[in-house]
């Protein structure tokens, strides 16, 4: 379990292991159910329990005047611990109601057969299971080649012996069939055996417990599913077809916001289905970029380290390691993201190594190459110990020998502001006019936001970032909470863990701290990069109680909960003069509900962990409220039987970020300080994080610092576009 304790003015949590258990492993004892039928015994009850209704998600639209829409509840999110009833069968998918299970079973049997997908004229099919599956149902995506050579994607939902198939144009989430997710799985116990209604249930091996899911409360009417399929443009589809169907060695690029990441995700999914995940090497030039796409660094995958040895030495090193040798020989496709930061000399070495290791004189030893990135952004890092001059990848011999297609994407999605797009293109090519320079200077103005969330500041150096965040955090009143990560990593891999993750080892927060989300939440509108503000710190059980008392979370509720959180596990403080004065200062109409929560809070164990409750801004006057509990941040190390993982709350202070860490991010509110710019491409990377000029502030702009490499400009003039 996670244990909360206070020291002076700081509150911390740390992980305490008992019998090898993790936070998700703890669960309350189970209650026996009175079963009426055999089917309901195995399939669970049909009615929602009171506990389940507590976890329902509330949605509101602050702009709407319709009172009838203010209390809409979405399906409850099961909490995997603190459940007083057995979760072994109570949440099974496909369960029958207790009232008339035979009638429900007859409905299922009488359902007409579905033929909603086009039959394939070929025998070739590629299938891969999705991650969101439960024991009672399985979701799969299958790709078929039709007669017109078009790659079709079919999603199949299997439940025991029944199977439903949908084409990719059907929104599965809107259908009557409810797909199970990881959060709907019963909580697994690490005990070797248990009893339920007289049945002895045995577990043959220890099962890794599931991590707790967040207790959420959503106040937004525009709830969109993060799992809905992405529709590619014609330009993007042609890039995908060149790679997947025609097996072409491709480099594709484009300015910031042209959908390079969307194409990459699609390619990875389809190639993994076609060849199997083991045959696809997913790499990037940096640890942060590698984690984002679910891969590893190019240096780690290839096994050559920094690559400063001779080719003979590197080949010998690879041949001496069986796993490394197998990876080189059985890889069919090598994907490299952020290719602009890879030195061309390194690619030349890798190409020769590939041909020698695979004993194949084809380009790159017969491995298909998929390269992506933007050479107008951050360039390769020069190494002081190398005599060779750093060169761009497109200047390497490997590029001339291997790359068949170089494609420039032209459609911009991130910025819908045409004037901002013109400014970014001018900076990108280093062709500033007097009017554009004047427009950028006019962006040096303050911007007020109604929700109080300040714009994220970007700086060129890490020290500027640290000073800004520390200064703003110290200026806030109240207690400081420190959340220390639990790392699962051998000592020799600790540096990899630190450099590959945006989530910090120690996260220090206060009430009103401004934070950024570091995980995607598929069940709400939260995405990696969302901005929010910490409202208060509470336990999970107190959040459930709060939702019973208050239907929505407004400013008055925030004031109430900040008062309540002070007395969690501390009955003596409740009787103090200072607390009594603060309590009596609250409106009289709120005192009755406040006393209920206070009496509940003082009975909570002082050892129960408190977590930040955050208000996230997801649109104009639209918010999501979420209790941020620790989550896992895994890192895959190729060929290493090591599970690197950091467990930490998915937050970081975001008053300020470095330009380097911001690369690849979309930031809704941006304040850029260009005072210490030192590298070509930094200004472009910084400003291209913005979405619109209305939310962009630029300080210390100097046209003389806009530098573009002429070799990069010449290269981009020769790129092919797909219309």
UniProtKB/Swiss-Prot annotation:
The places in or outside the cell where this protein is found are: Nucleus; Chromosome, Telomere
Q: What is its EC number?
A: 5.6.2.3
SMART domains recorded: AAA (SM00382)
Q: Where is the composition biased (Low complexity)?
A: 83-96
Which intervals of the chain are annotated as region Disordered? Answer: 1-31, 61-101
Q: Which EC class, in a word? A: isomerase
Residues binding ATP: 254-261
Signal peptide (from-to): none
Q: GO CC terms on record?
A: chromosome, telomeric region; mitochondrion; nuclear replication fork; replication fork
- Molecular functions per Gene Ontology: 5'-3' DNA helicase activity; ATP binding; ATP hydrolysis activity; centromeric DNA binding; DNA helicase activity; G-quadruplex DNA binding; single-stranded DNA binding
Keywords attached to this Swiss-Prot or TrEMBL record, sorted alphabetically, are: ATP-binding, Chromosome, DNA damage, DNA repair, DNA-binding, Helicase, Hydrolase, Isomerase, Nucleotide-binding, Nucleus, Phosphoprotein, Telomere
Per its record, the protein catalyses:
Couples ATP hydrolysis with the unwinding of duplex DNA at the replication fork by translocating in the 5'-3' direction. This creates two antiparallel DNA single strands (ssDNA). The leading ssDNA polymer is the template for DNA polymerase III holoenzyme which synthesizes a continuous strand; ATP + H2O = ADP + phosphate + H(+)
Q: Which residues carry this modification: Phosphoserine?
A: 64
The family database entries (Pfam families) matched by this protein are listed as: PIF1
Q: Which residues bind DNA?
A: 682-701
Single GO biological process annotation from the record: replication fork progression beyond termination site
Q: What is known of its domains?
A: The N-terminal part (residues 1 to 249) is essential for function and confers locus specificity.
Q: What else is known?
A: Present with 656 molecules/cell in log phase SD medium.
Q: How does it assemble?
A: Interacts with DEF1 and POL30.
| Function in brief | 5' to 3' DNA replicative helicase recruited to paused replisomes to promote fork progression throughout nonhistone protein-DNA complexes, naturally occurring impediments that are encountered in each S phase where replication forks pauses. Needed for normal fork progression through over 1000 discrete sites scattered throughout the genome, like rDNA, tRNA genes, centromeres, active replication origins, or transcriptional silencers. Required for timely replication of the telomere and subtelomeric DNA and for wild-type levels of telomeric silencing.
Family stated for the protein in its record? Belongs to the helicase family.
The molecule here is called: ATP-dependent DNA helicase RRM3
Q: Which organism is it from?
A: Saccharomyces cerevisiae (strain ATCC 204508 / S288c) (Baker's yeast)
> What is the gene called?
RRM3
